[in-house]
Amino acid sequence: MKKFADTVRRLLSIALNLFIVWAEPIALPMSWDWGKEQMFIFYTEDSNILSACICAMVAVGQLVCIFTGRELPRWLHTLKYIATCCLTMTFLTVVFVLGPMYKDGNGWYIMLCTSSMLYHHLLNPLAAIFSFVLLERSPRLPRSTVKWALLPTVLYGGIILWLNIQRVVDGPYPFMKVYDQSVQASVLWCIAILLMNYFYAWLLWKLNGGTKENA
């Protein structure tokens, strides 16, 4: 019975990971039609492309585990954790920051339910969170893993802020427009986003059943 339940869990995990892989070829052309190569300066696009690649690897890994009885390799589980943190960051930034910025009150609907944003801002993040928290609970990740979840955000933020300072790009997010706000505001936004990212990462680690022991 335990083996059957474990197989069902892995099959559900495969299904949700493949959903994210399947959604990306649908969403990317929509984003391309909207912004062409400019779409790649958005954290949303980059994190979803990264996550689709990782989810494809996880789906294959879970299939192998069904036949071998082993758990996912820790490095692969860690990658899925990082991808899930990126998509969670995207989803919650829309919900709590970008959505409310629309003065007409339609921000949440526009950014969660239209065009490629339906997949990139809503469905993909929810699929990643659900699969990681409920279906991919082993091997347990050590507490030290949490800091690695911030790496994509730090890399993206550092590059985009530098490009904004050099006036190569403008934004793409309002809080990254360094010449439209004070230096203090830019610094506070960076601190706030990293703190939010760390909190989301810690919460996902906790919900996944992470261990405090070093590994």
Predicted features and spans:
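Membrane-helix exit/interface motif
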Residues: 58-68, 89-106, 130-134
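Non-cytosolic membrane-interface motifs at loop->transmembrane helix junctions
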Residues: 37-45, 74-76, 104-119, 142-146, ...
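Alpha-helical transmembrane segments of multi-pass membrane proteins
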Residues: 17-32, 164
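Membrane-interface transmembrane-helix boundary segments in multi-pass integral membrane proteins
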Residues: 42, 165-206
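Interfacial segments of alpha-helical transmembrane regions
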Residues: 69-88, 142-151
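N-terminal membrane topogenic signal
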Residues: 1-19
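Membrane-interface loop-to-helix entry segments
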Residues: 114-126, 191
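Alpha-helical transmembrane segments in multipass membrane proteins, preferentially the mid-helix core
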Residues: 123-141
